[in-house]
Amino acid sequence: MSETLAERAAAFIVNAKNRNHSPAVVELAKRCLVDWMGVAIGASGEPVSRTVALSALAWGAQGEARILLGDRTTPALAALANATMGHALDFDDTRGHAPSHLSSPTWSAALAVAQHRDMDGVTALSAFITGYEISAVIGDVLAGGEDIGTYGFGNLMQGAGFHPTSVLGRLSATAAAAVLMGCSQEQAVNALATAATMGGGLTASFGTMAKPLHSGKAAMDGVQAAELAARGFIAAPEVFEAPGGFASAFVQTATTKFDDVTFSPGESLSDNSFKPYACGKLIHGHIDAARDLRDEWAERPVKQIRCRVAEISTRLVGRPLPTTHLEG
């Protein structure tokens, strides 16, 4: 029987400690850290950030992982609060193919576990690179069918109503945590399979506090999945490919094949990008166009501006009269 996707990803996880990443990859990972931490600190005073942080601290759980600008708690709860902050302004970095924001849940999980275990930044950096690569590659896997054509798995997932940051972010957070916890290959398989069955996050929640919570829960569940597996928890190793599993549940109108998936350290980071505007990237081009026209039309009356957009844009960011920045 051929290896499952979870088994191949687990092998990539356990070999993380033996890798020497290129300076270019390390620099990209550092930029992701700076971007995530910057937007998270910028969002620390937002109502959603305060609510989630206070809720996490109300558990009274003891640990050495710090909520940004706040107190210490367990790794899972710190990851929950910090990844929620990181996505609260919709300003965190994003992938070009699978529409996901992986740095927030992945760095939140990696930093929380590393702090709790008193591990150095280089080790946390390697864990982040490993986790990011796994989720990015899975999100980019081509899926399709006769009626719909071929698209990336992450794009089809979003079209079906699932938030890729939530679903894929759980896997990257799990992988990063598993690296730092020193999970065996069998434990890493079970950690990823556990994270896969926890997946969720609905795009109908966009425009509310629930959207940044998707990122927070992805980070929290990733840490918890790795912790459970490290203590002997067993899940389904074939969960990604099996009927009723990850692929068939999140993209029901297409066939997804993970047979040829391979992971290359840091390769997917080159497709990461940093947002110029704090809103969904689907409308960044329209903002650019408006800015280009601003000077030319500054002194002329404008009654109406019409923009052509994809159908999914109207569903995800189509709020003509937003009342909060969460609706961007």
Locations of regions flagged by a protein language model:
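Conserved phosphate/anionic-ligand binding catalytic regions in large, soluble enzymes, centered on
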Residues: 103-105, 167, 279-282, 328
